[in-house]
């Protein structure tokens, strides 16, 4: 990623993928009548869409290239702020949902901060710093919010009558 346009293409994809994944998680937990966690995931998807709109607004008048999914320069296989689906469970609590969201925001913040610290393009560094600062605010907000929810006791995921999938 060399240009502001390429940076914005990454920012747009990052927020879009985050919103889609949070919606997928909300849909999955809604099926299991986990309303509190579903609502938290819907809020996170909404916030991702707000950030997506901000990134798209910044892209007005900028040459933003179309980047093929396999050509994005992510630290891992997925965009850094995409919540890890492996960390979910149909009985997860708000504590778990917030932990998942917090980790995704930390990865997003780290991604942007890394660019702000090391990128050769001054304009990209400046934009990345702004994005990193905003993500740091989200990390703080989620860190404060998670304090309101106690970590669940051991065995929280035990279910004597788990859902079954018919083949």
Model-derived features with residue positions:
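Iron-associated oxidoreductase/ferritin-like identity signal
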Residues: 1-167
